[in-house]
Amino acid sequence: MKLWRLTRAPFVALDGKGAELFGARYAPPGHPVVSLASEAGLAVLVALRYQPPDLAGIPDDFVLGWTESDVTPERVPDPDEATIRACVGEWLESRRSLLAAIRSRVLPEADVIYLNPRHPDATRVPPLTTRPFSFAECLHTPPMLASFKGMT
């Protein structure tokens, strides 16, 4: 399976250091974990939620990256946020699987995929292949927008 990540270039390593220091949405600080997405579009949507609404001051060193793994992710139950957090914390501690899949709240048809860098198989995951990514280019106003405004 292809796994996607939109991040700044200095943070492409799949080591989970950022989450270890600051936590992740479903993981407390102190646990390294790498947040990935099952779809490139989900990686963009999730990253966009953390940017200023007017996109002012966004660094210009973002990259869209992907890696691949043949491992089937363990499905995390998701009846509520507390359950997800508890399950992810236990999953990270146990190191029983490399990947965990959490249904995305942003796009429920896709999954946030957590990679546990402390799992023994983490060293087998190839580093990200990346390309430059620009929010400004991605979200520019399309030239035909004016044509559609009168169609509502």
Language-model segments: residues:
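Extended catalytic/binding region for NAD+/ADP-ribose chemistry, centered on the ART fold
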Residues: 27-50, 113-118
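Active-site and NAD+-binding cores of ADP-ribose-processing enzymes
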Residues: 2-15, 27-28, 56-152
